[in-house]
Curated annotation (Swiss-Prot):
<feature type="region of interest" description="Fusion peptide">
    <location>
        <begin position="117"/>
        <end position="141"/>
    </location>
</feature>
<dbReference type="GO" id="GO:0019031">
    <property type="term" value="C:viral envelope"/>
</dbReference>
<keyword id="KW-1032">Host cell membrane</keyword>
<comment type="similarity">
    <text>Belongs to the paramyxoviruses fusion glycoprotein family.</text>
</comment>
<keyword id="KW-0564">Palmitate</keyword>
<keyword id="KW-1169">Fusion of virus membrane with host cell membrane</keyword>
<comment type="subunit">
    <text>Homotrimer of disulfide-linked F1-F2.</text>
</comment>
<dbReference type="GO" id="GO:0046718">
    <property type="term" value="P:symbiont entry into host cell"/>
</dbReference>
<keyword id="KW-1015">Disulfide bond</keyword>
<feature type="glycosylation site" description="N-linked (GlcNAc...) asparagine; by host">
    <location>
        <position position="447"/>
    </location>
</feature>
<comment type="function">
    <text>Class I viral fusion protein. Under the current model, the protein has at least 3 conformational states: pre-fusion native state, pre-hairpin intermediate state, and post-fusion hairpin state. During viral and plasma cell membrane fusion, the heptad repeat (HR) regions assume a trimer-of-hairpins structure, positioning the fusion peptide in close proximity to the C-terminal region of the ectodomain. The formation of this structure appears to drive apposition and subsequent fusion of viral and plasma cell membranes.</text>
</comment>
<keyword id="KW-1160">Virus entry into host cell</keyword>
<feature type="signal peptide">
    <location>
        <begin position="1"/>
        <end position="31"/>
    </location>
</feature>
<feature type="coiled-coil region">
    <location>
        <begin position="466"/>
        <end position="491"/>
    </location>
</feature>
<keyword id="KW-1162">Viral penetration into host cytoplasm</keyword>
<feature type="disulfide bond" description="Interchain (between F2 and F1 chains)">
    <location>
        <begin position="76"/>
        <end position="199"/>
    </location>
</feature>
<dbReference type="GO" id="GO:0055036">
    <property type="term" value="C:virion membrane"/>
</dbReference>
Length: 553
């Protein structure tokens, strides 16, 4: 197949606002209307808002792993804290060593820097092979080197504070928030309560909470064991480390509550460890967030197709999987540059492909313009749930209604059946029981038939069969041509020359003229002969009358 033309829109930061303003001038329209398409086996499964993003925002989380106990309770919690401290050091020291090796690999010499940089990466990978993601992570780690050094200068003050969350701004080039999940626990349980606890109970509570946090740390840094410092931390891992205090950093970086859940689901918020200090048990993580530009008038519509019944067999509609609509323009959307969530689509660039007039007309509601392929087999899932109702091909599967009892039949020539709560309350399909709560109102087109001219061949086997038929037709045509040539070869070429043809034409015209003249003369003679016969008959009759008159006298 030939390459398709496409519209490629890169989205550097300076173009985000310009693109958003341009698209905001276009008239807002409703999404693609799936009601006339459902009965043709084309189902609109949902819409997503289209956003463009670049990963440009960064901030730092300074995780305070070791909490400060109140003075009167330090002795009680000493044993579990010391055991916890030793376990932390054992667990995170390889991570800290790897971070230092990579950061120290930066030198002033360009060529030597590259060699030492790559060597540091490969030396920290267990298998000895550095992937592109690991190189990117190591590059980000080196870029955060100065910020990590600034944080280390403040480590004593960070470790000494009893605050669970506070901003660190002294000498830092980017926003940094110090958080302590364990400090939050200590503050809630011991500092901010008047309840007196005995020493044994304090040790038990602290020990249990520290063990739980160690389990979370082991889960978070499990991938770092095989490849220290080069594996990005997910947003879920960051929340495990920082607890609810993670929201403070995200809010400071400009992530609104309406975007937070969507961004968390997208996986675009990631973190890279940039420092670990075993003396104060300080862990620094650089968090990367995307700069998101929302395109208010642009949405992505997802389409699914069902295997429908046609007079040529089962077929599936030839439509794009995802289309985008801005105003009255509908084009196919390439989602390979996008990350999707339940409600949003985040793309580094917008790439669309124009559709043929036939597909455009089809998606606009003219189902007679839709084309179908016979590539779908009988084992294809012949039904789909849509808003509490079901669209099913009841010729491929048995549509058994349990309430009220009965079998739903599909009319001859009908592509699919639209089944809602008005026709069946409880539906059974291939052993799956569904309780229907939705309905297809009068705006849904029903009883759509697929014409033979709408079904084309696209599968490899079918194309081979059709090509065989074409070859047979061509062979038959060649045989007919050979017969014609053999007959033409028997014709005397001299008789078909130009002068001979002119002579034939002149003689033919002369013959026609003589023929016409002869015909006219013959007609004239016949007419004259008939006139003479009439005259003789009249004379004979008169003579007979005279003879009769004489005889009577």
């Amino acid at each position: 197949m030939g390459s398709r033309s496409s519209t490629r829109i890169p989205v550097p930061l300076m173009l985000i606002i310009r693109t958003a303003l341009t698209l905001s001038c276009i008239r807002l329209t409703s999404s693609l209307d799936g009601r006339p398409l459902a009965a043709a086996g084309i189902v609109v499964t949902g819409d997503k808002a289209v956003n463009i993003y670049t990963s440009s925002q960064t901030g730092s989380i300074i995780v305070k792993l070791l909490p400060n106990m109140p003075k009167d309770k330090e002795v009680c919690a000493k044993a579990p804290l010391e055991a916890y401290n030793r376990t932390l050091t054992t667990l995170l020291t390889p991570l800290g060593d790897s971070i230092r090796r990579i950061q120290e690999s930066v030198t002033t010499s360009g060529g030597r820097r590259q060699r030492r940089f790559i060597g540091a990466i490969i030396g920290s990978v267990a298998l000895g092979v550095a992937t592109a993601a690991q190189i990117t992570a190591a590059s980000a780690l080196i870029q955060a080197n100065q910020n990590a050094a600034n944080i280390l200068r403040l480590k004593e003050s960070i470790a000494a504070t009893n605050e669970a969350v506070h901003e660190v701004t002294d000498g830092l080039s980017q926003l940094a928030v110090a958080v302590g999940k364990m400090q939050q626990f200590v503050n809630d349980q011991f500092n901010n309560t008047a309840q007196e606890l005995d020493c044994i109970k304090i040790a038990q509570q602290v020990g249990v909470e520290l063990n739980l946090y160690l389990t979370e740390l082991t889960t978070v840094f499990g991938p770092q064991i095989t490849s220290p410092a080069l594996t990005q931390l997910t947003i879920q891992a960051l929340y495990n480390l920082a607890g609810g205090n993670m929201d403070y950093l995200l809010t400071k970086l400009g992530v609104g509550n309406n975007q937070l859940s969507s961004l968390i689901g997208s996986g675009l918020i990631t973190g890279n460890p940039i420092l670990y200090d075993s003396q104060t048990q300080i862990l620094g993580i650089q968090v990367t967030l995307p700069s998101v530009g929302n395109l208010n008038n642009m949405r992505a519509t997802y389409l699914e197709t069902l295997s429908v019944s046609t007079t040529k067999g089962f077929a599936s509609a030839l439509v794009p999987k995802v289309v985008t609509q801005v105003g009255s323009v509908i084009e196919e959307l390439d989602t390979s540059y996008c990350i999707g969530t339940d409600l949003d689509l985040y793309c580094t660039r917008i790439v669309t492909f124009p559709m043929s007039p036939g597909i455009y007309s089809c998606l606009s509601g003219n189902t007679s313009a839709c084309m179908y392929s016979k590539t779908e087999g009988a084992l294809t899932t012949p039904y789909m749930a849509l808003k509490g109702s079901v669209i099913a091909n009841c010729k491929l599967t048995t549509c058994r209604c349990a309430d009220p009892p009965g079998i739903i039949s599909q009319n001859y020539g009908e592509a699919v059946s639209l089944i809602d709560r008005h026709s069946c309350n409880v539906l059974s399909l291939d052993g799956i029981t569904l309780r229907l709560s939705g309905e297809f109102d009068a705006t849904y087109q029903k009883n759509i038939s697929i014409l033979d001219s709408q079904v084309i061949v696209t599968g490899n086997l079918d194309i081979s069969t059709e090509l065989g038929n074409v070859n047979n037709s061509i062979s038959n045509a060649l045989n007919k041509l050979e017969e014609s040539n053999s007959k033409l070869d028997k014709v005397n070429v001299k008789l078909t020359s130009t002068s001979a043809l002119i002579t034939y034409i002149v003689l033919t015209v002369i013959s026609l003229v003589f023929g016409v003249l002869s015909l006219v003369l013959a007609c004239y003679l016949m007419y004259k002969q008939k006139a003479q016969q009439k005259t003789l008959l009249w004379l004979g009759n008169n003579t007979l009358d005279q003879m009769r008159a004489t005889t009577k006298i």
